From Swiss-Prot:
GO terms for biological process: cell division; cell wall organization; peptidoglycan biosynthetic process; regulation of cell shape. Belongs to the MurB family. Residues 33-197 form the FAD-binding PCMH-type domain. Its cofactor is FAD. This is UDP-N-acetylenolpyruvoylglucosamine reductase. Pathway: Cell wall biogenesis; peptidoglycan biosynthesis. The lineage of its organism: Bacteria, Bacillati, Bacillota, Bacilli, Bacillales. It holds the Pfam family FAD_binding_4. It is found in: Cytoplasm. One of its GO terms (cellular component) is cytosol. Cell wall formation. One of its GO terms (molecular function) is FAD binding.
Length: 307
C-alpha cells in the first residue's frame, strides 16, 4: 500500500513529474531484474536531493540511491520507501586541467570529454559502465587505473540532508571501498585533476583498452559487471574458472563462458537466480581453494513474497 501522505509531502519538495509511484526498477538495471520502488524520484538539482533526504530522515523513511544500475542487483520484492535516481545530475564542466562532473554523469562520457580537451588520467575509465557517483562510491578502476588516482574532491549529502565536501584523503579510497560507504553518504558531484596530454595518444590508449575489454568481457548479454572483488594474491575469475564453473547455470543466469568473473542473464533470469548463483560460486570456490570470494556487486531490496 502506497502512503498518500508521503506522496503529498514529496509533491511539496519536488515537481510532480519527477515522482513515480510503484515504479518497476528492472527498467533501470543492467541485469534487467528487480521489483518495484514505492517512490522513485528523479531530481535535477542538488537542493532537491537535500530536501527529500532531509524529509525522509525526519520521518524515518528509508532512502536508496541509484546511479545507472550497472553494478547492482535489486531483488524482486522491490525497495520500500524512496528511491532517488541521480542520473539527471549529469553535468560535466571543464576548467583548465580539472573536470567537475555530476553524480549521474557516465564516467565513460567524462573520460571522453577529458580526451576531447587533451587531458590525460581518465583513460582507464573509458569502458567502465558506471556513473560518477557509483565510481567514487566504490573507487572504480580498470587496467591499472582507479578513481583514487585523479579525484580532487567529492561533494556529498549526508543522511540528514546536509552537504559535505570531502578531499581525496578524506574520502579514504581503497580497493572498491570508500568513506562514503561507511558513513552512508551519497555523491552529488566530483572534481578530477588531470594532466595535459596529446589527444592522439589518449585516443590510442582508449582504443586499446576498449578492444581488450570487448574481446574479454561478455558485453552481448545483460550482466551486473564484475561480480567479485579480487582476493589478495588471486584473481576471482581464475578461481572460478579453475573450479569448472564456467557455463554453470541457475535459472536464467549463468557464469559467463567468455569471462568467469561475470554472470550473464541469458534467459529471463531473475535477481533470485543471480543471488543463488553467487552463493553457489562462493561455496564451490571456498570448498576447492579455501578462499572467500567477497562480492563487488551490491544486492539490495526485499526478497519476493512466497506465493
Amino acid at each position: 500500500m502506497i502512503n498518500k501522505d508521503i506522496y503529498q509531502a514529496l509533491q511539496q519538495l519536488i515537481p510532480n513529474e519527477k515522482i513515480k509511484v510503484d515504479e518497476p526498477l528492472k527498467r533501470y538495471t543492467y541485469t534487467k531484474t528487480g521489483g518495484n520502488a514505492d517512490f522513485y524520484i528523479t531530481p535535477t538539482k542538488n537542493v532537491e536531493v537535500q530536501a527529500v533526504v532531509k524529509y525522509a530522515y525526519q520521518n524515518e523513511i528509508p532512502v536508496t540511491y541509484l546511479g545507472n544500475g550497472s553494478n547492482i542487483i535489486i531483488r524482486e520484492g522491490g525497495i520500500r520507501g524512496i528511491v532517488i535516481s541521480l542520473l539527471s545530475l549529469d553535468h560535466i564542466e571543464v576548467s583548465d586541467d580539472a573536470i567537475i562532473a555530476g553524480s549521474g554523469a557516465a564516467i565513460i562520457d567524462v573520460s571522453r570529454v577529458a580526451r576531447d580537451y587533451a587531458l590525460t588520467g581518465l583513460e582507464f575509465a573509458c569502458g567502465i559502465p558506471g556513473s560518477i557517483g557509483g565510481a567514487v562510491y566504490m573507487n572504480a578502476g580498470a587496467y591499472g587505473g582507479e578513481v583514487k588516482d585523479c579525484i580532487d574532491y567529492a561533494l556529498c549529502v549526508n543522511e540528514q540532508g546536509s552537504l559535505v565536501k570531502l578531499t581525496t584523503k578524506e574520502l579514504e579510497l581503497d580497493y572498491r571501498n570508500s568513506i562514503i560507504q561507511k558513513e552512508h553518504l551519497v555523491v552529488l558531484e566530483a572534481a578530477f585533476t588531470l594532466a595535459p596530454g596529446k589527444m592522439t595518444e589518449i585516443q590510442a590508449k582508449m582504443d586499446d583498452l576498449t578492444e581488450r575489454r570487448e574481446s574479454k568481457q561478455p558485453l552481448e548479454y545483460p550482466s551486473c559487471g564484475s561480480v567479485f572483488q579480487r582476493p589478495p594474491g588471486h584473481f576471482a575469475g581464475k578461481l572460478i574458472q579453475d573450479s569448472n564453473l564456467q557455463g554453470h547455470r541457475i535459472g536464467g543466469v549463468e557464469v559467463s563462458t567468455k569471462h568467469a568473473g561475470f554472470m550473464v542473464n541469458v534467459d529471463n533470469g531473475t535477481a533470485t537466480d543471480y543471488e543463488n548463483l553467487i552463493h553457489y560460486v562462493q561455496k564451490t570456490v571456498k570448498e576447492k581453494f579455501g578462499i572467500e570470494l567477497n562480492r563487488e556487486v551490491r544486492i539490495i531490496g526485499e526478497h519476493p513474497k512466497e506465493s
